[in-house]
Curated annotation (Swiss-Prot):
The active site is at C85, H181, E183. Keywords: ATP-binding, Glutamine amidotransferase, GMP biosynthesis, Ligase, Nucleotide-binding, Purine biosynthesis. This is GMP synthase [glutamine-hydrolyzing]. The gene is guaA. Catalyzes the synthesis of GMP from XMP.
Length: 525
């Protein structure tokens, strides 16, 4: 079996919102890479032994005192280096070039760069040709400062009207700088540039692919676990499902999955999880029906954050009780993925922001004394999904819209009651079913229904009824950081509304949420 970590790229993070995207692109090319904070030590880089280094972008200004710098060793390690945006600026500054602060001359958004000379990084790449026969490339810029003088040994490779050094290269040392962002899709041939860097310039082999990752993960799990038993909290979500399948392949019946039905799941979800993993795949699953326990614990509580905490606490209590029954279990498996690891690691200098804690089994009691098994901790979400497909999990389960950890606990506004959850489940199932029928489900990023604790007058036949209100929510987004409300067709919305009001006894009014993010969040609570 080839070593999927044999060839690798190190990406140093200077705080850009696009940095994780660079890592995902390199992985898509088929090369393993890791994302570290910019302030790593020479010893750490030596130990990692990368075949190439990428200096990512960042929000700081190279001209400011105490702004981040690449470790000097990056430029003496003898491996190719690619600086992107801020990464190009700090490379230039550190190697003897000059960077000036942009005063109203920044470039943000689409730009066309003119190629001035050939470079390995841009070999065979052009989007258009200007009147002088020079190749032009469509790229995405996002910078205020710019390089005003390049270091000795470098040549200008590309320019724009306002940026004399849109790309630079020292081909002998294999140092390259680009002022634009090749990792974003708006840079039309960005993937080809990154591919040139990783495969041709750094000489990496494209070993990083789903089948090899699975093989490697199973091998490592067998080594780590040996003949021991493992316990896993299976939610039916993407991460825990893929962990379950990997462990099942590696250790078979030595895996015990605990599926806690908290009464806050989607329609028929508990039955589907048990059928798929228990009956179809033959996993060993303990099904805990804890609906009443969760609902009792939340009785009278209307505050969203308090509800989240209660749901988390009760889950931990139940999981702790069940794990004690599995006396032979020595390991706890978790669905930690690479972005969780990056967020937790932060930066030694405190430049990285602290992100909210995840609703995961992370808060388990300290006295559990179980070793931790995290087979997905090197993987991004899109990689986890691809592996899931390879392991035989159904596409519609791996690629369905995000569902919050606390489930309907945060989609029933205010106090959570069984009656509200049952109504919401049925209304939501109709909305999702109609989206699939109209071929709209995959055209929106997330769609769901929210239960509003207000009654509204309705007329049914000759009688009036005074029933509950639900809101439909559908958004379009690239990264879930910002989102637009989805402009679904009126006739479609009318059809969904009619079905819900006619088929779900207890709901008399359906509204559609037309709020973007910001200012509204995607979920209501």
């Amino acid at each position: 079996m080839s070593d999927i970590h044999e060839h690798k790229i190190l990406i140093l993070d200077f705080g850009s919102q696009y940095t994780q995207l660079i890592a995902r692109r390199i992985r898509e090319i088929g090369v393993y890479c890791e994302l570290w904070a910019w302030d790593v030590t020479e010893a750490q880089i030596r130990e990692f032994a990368p075949n190439g280094i990428i200096l990512a972008g960042g929000p700081e200004s190279v001209t400011a005192e105490n702004s981040p710098r690449a470790p000097e060793y990056v430029f003496t390690a003898g491996v190719p280096v690619l600086g992107i945006c801020y990464g190009m600026q700090t490379m230039s500054e550190q190697l003897g070039g000059k960077v000036i602060q942009g005063v109203g001359e920044g470039e943000f958004g689409y730009a066309q760069i003119e190629m001035l000379t050939d470079s390995l990084l841009f070999k065979g790449i052009e989007d258009a040709v200007n009147s002088e026969g020079k190749p032009l490339l469509d790229v995405w810029m996002s910078h205020g400062d710019k390089v005003s003088a390049i270091p000795e040994g470098f040549v200008a490779v590309a320019k724009t009207d306002t940026c004399p050094f849109a790309a630079m290269a020292n081909e002998e040392k294999q140092f390259f700088g680009v002022q634009f962002h090749p990792e974003v899709t708006h840079t039309r041939q960005g993937m080809r540039m990154l591919s040139h860097f990783a495969l041709d310039i750094c000489g990496c082999a494209a070993n990083w692919k789903p089948s090899s990752i699975i093989e490697d993960a199973i091998e490592r799990l067998k080594k780590q676990i040996g003949d021991d038993e493992v316990i896993l909290g299976l939610s039916g979500g993407v991460d825990s499902s893929v962990v379950a399948m990997l462990l099942h392949r590696a250790i078979g019946k030595k895996l015990t999955c605990v599926f806690v039905d908290n009464g806050l799941l989607r329609l028929n979800e508990a039955e589907q999880v048990m059928e798929m993993f228990g009956d179809h795949f033959g996993l060993n699953i303990i099904h805990v029906d804890a609906e009443n326990r969760f609902l009792d614990a939340m009785k009278g509580e209307a505050d969203p954050e308090a509800k989240r905490k209660i749901i988390g606490r009760v889950f931990v209590e139940i999981f702790d009780e069940e794990s004690k029954k599995c006396a032979n279990a020595k390991w706890l498996a978790q669905g930690t993925i690479y972005p969780d690891v990056i967020e937790s690691a932060g930066s030694a200098t405190g430049k990285a922001h602290v992100i909210k804690s995840h609703h995961n089994v992370g808060g388990l009691p300290d006295d559990m004394e179980l070793g931790l098994v995290e087979p997905l901790r090197e993987l991004f979400k899109d990689e986890v999904r691809k592996i899931g497909l390879e392991l035989g999990l159904p596409y519609n389960m791996l690629y369905r819209h995000p569902f919050p950890g606390p489930g309907l606990g945060v989609r029933v506004l205010g106090e959570v009651k069984k009656e509200y959850c049952d109504l919401l489940r049925r209304a939501d199932a109709i909305f999702i079913e109609e989206l699939h029928k109209a071929d709209l489900y995959n055209k929106v990023s997330q769609a769901f229904t929210v239960f509003l604790p207000v009654r509204s007058v309705g007329v049914m036949g000759d009688g009036r009824k005074y029933d509950w209100v639900v809101s439909l929510r559908a958004v379009e987004t690239v990264d879930f950081m910002t989102a637009h409300w989805a402009h679904l067709p009126y006739d479609f919305l009318g059809r969904v509304s009619n079905r819900i009001i006619n088929e779900v006894d207890g709901i008399s009014r359906v509204v559609y949420d037309i709020s973007g993010k910001p200012p509204a969040t995607i979920e209501w609570e």
